[in-house]
From Swiss-Prot:
Signal peptide segment: none
Bilayer-spanning residue ranges: none
Enzymatic reactions: CMP + ATP = CDP + ADP; dCMP + ATP = dCDP + ADP
Coiled-coil blocks: none
Residues that, per the record, bind ATP: 18-26
Major localization class: cytoplasm
Pfam families associated with the record: Cytidylate_kin
GO molecular function, one term: CMP kinase activity
Organism ancestry: Bacteria, Bacillati, Actinomycetota, Actinomycetes, Kitasatosporales
Protein name: Cytidylate kinase
GO biological process terms, semicolon-separated: nucleobase-containing small molecule interconversion; pyrimidine nucleotide metabolic process
Gene that encodes it: cmk
InterPro entries recorded: Cytidylate_kin (IPR003136), Cytidylate_kinase_dom (IPR011994), P-loop_NTPase (IPR027417)
Enzyme Commission code(s) on record: 2.7.4.25
Length: 231
């Protein structure tokens, strides 16, 4: 930093992967804020392109139609962990992308190779431009998007714990139905041909089932600080 400020820690790129309901978003945002890093929710980008497909009448069950439209929407992600934003063609879609309709279609859209290529390129560009480093959360960050990330973390939790957390986030959601939906999405994301949900071989696995959010955050912050100290 200029103006006689204390030298900053080396820029660090942190990849946090895992299925839904493991605490990825809450952990990633808090860690980024605590360490002065940028933050990127890659799931929101896939939700955003899915929302655009639905809004524009694209049949999300037709991979050819989805592939043909993949390059059309302009998706912009704000990376401030205190208030991350996402817009599509200039429209704020932070709320609309969290609907049940988008949630039910995002796996199918995300499985289309042309969509993954488009969004992956966008994610790499954002990560490379982060001045002090970035925490990037998703499902294939450590394996595909940023295989050279300084630190890779894979969050896990039991299906029951994840369902309870997700149903708390989705107003009025039934825990049993949420659990079934999570298991179905895990299967879809883990079995897709292009960039499946998977733990990188060099990732640190953190089971969040019995941990409070502050405990998970503390664990990840410690891992990042150890990695930065060794750079």
């Amino acid at each position: 930093m200029e103006n006689g400020a204390a030298p900053t820690a080396p820029a660090v790129i942190v990849a946090i992967d895992g299925p839904s309901g493991t605490g990825k978003s809450s952990t990633s945002k808090a860690v980024a804020a605590q360490l002065g890093l940028s933050y990127l929710d890659t799931g929101a980008q896939y939700r955003a392109i899915t929302w655009w497909m639905v809004t524009n009448g694209i049949d999300t069950d037709d991979p050819h139609a989805v592939a043909a439209a993949a390059g059309k929407p302009e998706i912009v992600s704000g990376t401030d962990p205190a208030g991350p934003t996402i817009t599509v063609d200039g429209v704020d879609v932070a709320g609309p992308i969290r609907t049940q309709e988008v949630t039910s279609k995002v796996s199918a859209v995300s499985a289309v190779p042309e969509v993954r290529a488009r969004i992956t390129e966008l994610q790499r560009t954002i990560a490379a431009a982060a001045p002090l480093g970035i925490v990037v959360e998703g499902r294939d960050i450590g394996t595909t998007v940023l295989p050279d990330a300084d630190l890779k973390i894979f969050l896990t939790a039991s299906a029951e714990a994840r369902a309870a957390r997700r149903s708390g986030e989705l107003k009025g959601a039934d825990v049993h139905a949420t659990r079934e939906a999570l298991i179905k999405r895990d299967a879809a994301d883990s079995s897709r041909k292009t960039s499946p949900l998977a733990k990188a071989g060099d990732a640190v696995e953190v089971d969040t089932t019995a941990l409070s959010l502050p405990q998970v955050i503390e664990c990840v912050v410690t891992l990042v600080e150890e990695k930065r100290a060794g750079k």
